[in-house]
Regions:
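Short beta-loop-alpha junction of Rossmann-like oxidoreductase domains
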Residues: 1, 82, 88-100
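A short helix-coil junction within the Rossmann-fold of NAD(P)-dependent oxidoreductases
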Residues: 1, 28-37
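Substrate-binding pocket helix/loop in short-chain dehydrogenase/reductase
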Residues: 1-3, 7-12
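Catalytic loop of short-chain dehydrogenase/reductase
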Residues: 8, 34, 40-65, 70-79, ...
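A short, exposed helix-loop element centered on a Lys and neighboring polar residues
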Residues: 26-27, 71
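C-terminal helical subdomain
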Residues: 86-87, 94, 102-145
Length: 148
């Protein structure tokens, strides 16, 4: 829907799912992750966090806010062993994707399990990257900071 036409309850639901639930999860799991000498946290984002795609307002805004939340958490853990990163899985064969792109051939997209396989290496003790965005399709981390 156009941004001005989104119902308040729909907007609130998107914010609750993508931001508040992650914040609550952070509050719950952080003590456990900090007890580990190799705590790792990955938070799923979306490419729409970086684009102003028409009719995606609440979702895009929530994913952009989510990425900032994750970067703040990573900065707060800078002096700990905990590594925190966001993940942009790229187009993935999900029910949400099918609803958003009904004419798209799902066979052209990876299944969630295939995406998850690529994330395993981000959870290993030897990972030393934190506060970045991992783009699954490009198989690389990108930095958020713009060149000065």
């Amino acid at each position: 829907s156009p941004l001005a036409h989104v119902e308040a309850k729909v907007f609130d639901q998107v914010i609750d799912i993508n931001i508040k639930s992650t914040w609550r999860l952070i509050r719950s799991v952080e003590p456990l992750l900090l007890k580990s000498d190799a705590g790792r946290a990955l938070v799923l984002s979306s490419s729409v966090a970086h684009t102003a795609r028409a009719f995606w307002g609440p979702y895009a805004a929530s994913k952009a806010a989510l990425e900032v939340l994750v970067r703040v958490w990573a900065e707060e853990q800078e002096k700990t062993a905990l590594k925190v990163n966001s993940v942009d899985p790229g187009g993935t064969r999900t029910a949400m994707r099918a609803r958003a792109f009904p004419g798209e051939d799902p066979a052209t997209l990876p299944k969630p399990a295939e995406v998850a396989e690529k994330l395993i290496k981000l959870c290993t003790p030897d990972l030393d990257v934190t506060g970045k965005l991992f783009k699954v399709r490009e198989d690389r981390f990108v930095d958020y900071r713009l060149p000065e």
